[in-house]
Every structure is written in structure tokens, then in C-alpha cells.
């Protein structure tokens, strides 16, 4: 790979993303596809761009990303986490701004398991008084 690149691993729910950043023109490639092609939802594209827009490096870095597992929202969150970690490796002075925005912390929320005797994780069967 290129000699002047930085790497970050991001995770969210059951998704895992590997992010490589290097100086360039702002091209974002996810699993060999453009950002706009990979994510149909505008919200997912916004989530991916958030850390770059915060530190104003949107058009100065090229991103090469591979992401596996989970759905659209989980993958977008994993990519955001990975980009954040790669940016901190690229320039440690960006850490306070990224931390203040809440991008550094790994979102530990997971799907709650279904319990025996219940319909879903918390949904109880309808109560019948008589």
C-alpha cells in the first residue's frame, strides 16, 4: 500500500470498518464503490462525512474503506468511528474537537436479547383480567 497513509478501525452494532486515509482530493471509496452509490440514504452519507466536515479536511483526504456486517446505520456508524480513529493517527491535535463532538467514543449499544415468555425483548403478552 501507499507509504503516507493512516489507518483506523471502527465498530458499531455488528458492523466493522477498516479505514485508510491519505492526502488527496476528497474521494471516498467504500467496498470498491463511491459513497453515493454505496449508501442510498442521505442520512448515512451525512454520518460518514461528519468527522471530515468537523475538522475541515473533506477535500484534502482520500478515503479507502472496507466494511462488513450489520445494516446501513451500523455500517455508517462504524465508518464514522474508523474515520475518527484514522484522523487522530493522522493528526493528534484533532482529538479534542472529535472528542467534544462525541465521535471518539465507541457506541456500545447493542440489540437487547429476546426473553422467554415475552413477545420481544420487553413486549409482554396482553394482560387479560378475566
UniProtKB/Swiss-Prot annotation:
Keyword annotations for this protein?
Answer: Ribonucleoprotein, Ribosomal protein
Cellular component per GO? cytosolic small ribosomal subunit
Q: Does the keyword Ribosomal protein apply?
A: yes
Ranges in a coiled coil: none
- Could you confirm whether the keyword Cell cycle appears in this record? no
Q: Which Gene3D superfamilies match?
A: 3.30.230.10
Under SUPFAM superfamilies, the record lists: Ribosomal protein S5 domain 2-like (SSF54211)
What are the recorded Gene Ontology BP terms? Answer: translation
Which Pfam families does the protein's record reference? Ribosomal_S9 (PF00380)
Q: Give the top-rank taxon of the lineage listed in the UniProt record for this protein.
A: Bacteria
Q: Which GO terms describe its molecular function?
A: RNA binding; structural constituent of ribosome
Record-stated family:
Belongs to the universal ribosomal protein uS9 family.
Classification via HAMAP family: Ribosomal_uS9_B
Q: List the protein's name.
A: Small ribosomal subunit protein uS9
